[in-house]
Amino acid sequence: MGFPTKIQLIKRAASEQWYVNFPSAVAQAMELQKGEVVEWVIEDKQRLTLKRTNQPVELEKKNYALSLTDELDSLFNECHPAFSSHRAWAKSRELMYGELTCLGRHTVTGMLTASGNQFCDWSGAYRLFSEQRVDLPRIMQVVQANVLKEASCLPYVVAHLDDTVIKKTGRLIPGTAWRRDPLGPRFQTNLVWGQRFIQLSLALPREGQIGQSRAIPVDFHHCPTAVRPRQPAEEERWQAYREEKKAARLSHQGSERIALLRRALDDQGYRDKELVVGVDGSYTNKEVLRKLPRGTTLVGRVRKDTKLYGLPQAKPGSGRKCVYGTRLPTPEEVRRSDQVPWQQVEAWAAGKAHRFDIKVVRDARWRSAGPQNLTLVVVRPLGYRLSKGSRMLYREPAYLICTETGLDIQAILQAYLWRWEIEVDFREEKTLLGCGQAQVRNPNSAESLPAFVAALYGLLHLASHRAAASPNAAMLPRPKWYRREDAKRITTGDLLNNLRAQLWAKAANQNFSDFVNSQIKTRSLRNEPSYNGSAAFYVRN
């Protein structure tokens, strides 16, 4: 049985090419597979014979790139057990995308509007938090487990601890009080009305022990101050107030959060990994240093006039043993002294690797730390120029202590430098995601809604880290004023713009690259271009 077949001969200078129009009836009858190799045999000028080979069909698997929304959905699916029902999970998923794509104030109604639910019942969104239908610590556990999995290249776990104040205006919001304004000038102590939270973040390095890092929130704890009883009050009420006041101190709360993180690491199978916690000077005190759990190292700043001591000499006989030896020079005196030599250590800071000059004094003791041995690290300030021809300026020197004398100096310095990322977290959570803008007065909602925003911030950056590993990651073209460097990390604002573009591309059933044109050309002045895409997907906050 024969089938008419069209054959075209193309003669070239070095070869001849034959193009055969394969009959579809033959392909259907023979049940050919995609990728199967066949042979055409020319028997005469009027006849071609098709022969099938027995070669196995090997199809190349396409490398489908997972987008930011795919990774975000995958992570949020892991959080399903943290919700009281599937309906609560679905509602929270809508609020998540509404929070991350909202262009106005990040209130609950703003989340509902951004997710397309402005014409639906809004009370269910408020009840998610007021009736505690979301287990936020369990969501943080999912974030923590994924960060530890992605940061397995580190032989230890690096964490950052700090507190922040969320400004509020309502006097009836639970947990609000007058706080010291950290943004006030040095010569004047200003006060602001707001809530106080403690955040613990884990470092998610991009490339090993020396390189860029993100601080992913794994704990966002509300720390209200104790309410002073009014006069006249019974003595029992005053005694209870004093106990609540001690328990509400930030140093006490921070010590408890560190111990809680250490227990969580042990439960997740990381008992053998050391936990290195970077803190600022407000947590380098007796309350935190003397209550460190097993397997935990603290790296914190101290004053330049801190009084340190050497190890005591062993004395024979009975009696009380000495805990502190002779006085050592203060950190500032160590920096100025020539007896302790400078040594260079490489670490990542301010967008690139630097070589820092440091001085190290081991086996020092401090009365706030008790009998444990400490390591003092003095960091010489880096020089920088505001312009190419300007004079050299210097930053402030840093004085650090570490509770583990055997830890590598490079690890101590890098853990301290990575701690700055938690300050970036606070700024972006407040400015970009509107943490604390939700207008709620229920005690549960006032505590859980800011923590929900912090958890979404961690999920967003974790999804970005996983999506960036794909070679074909779909990303918006960067503006022209950005530096064309692959080492530059994606900002949180760019992540939100990419997420918004990917969601709108799915809704409009368009190709991702069709949204933004790098050049807009018009045939006449009357043809005005539309800048809606740039306005929506290149928002600058």
Please provide the spans of the model-predicted regions:
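Long, compositionally biased stretches
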Residues: 1-14, 33-60, 356-366, 370-372
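Gly/Ser/Thr-rich loops at beta-strand to alpha-helix junctions
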Residues: 102, 165-167, 280-285
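Gly/serine-rich nucleotide phosphate-binding loop at the start of the catalytic core
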Residues: 61-130, 136
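Active-site-proximal, Lys/Arg-enriched surface segment
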Residues: 130-229, 361
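Single, function-defining residue in the core of a domain
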Residues: 61-80, 172, 209-541
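Short hydrophobic beta-strand that contains or immediately precedes a catalytic carboxylate
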Residues: 21-22, 160-161, 278, 416
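Structural motif
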Residues: 83-91, 187-193, 439-450
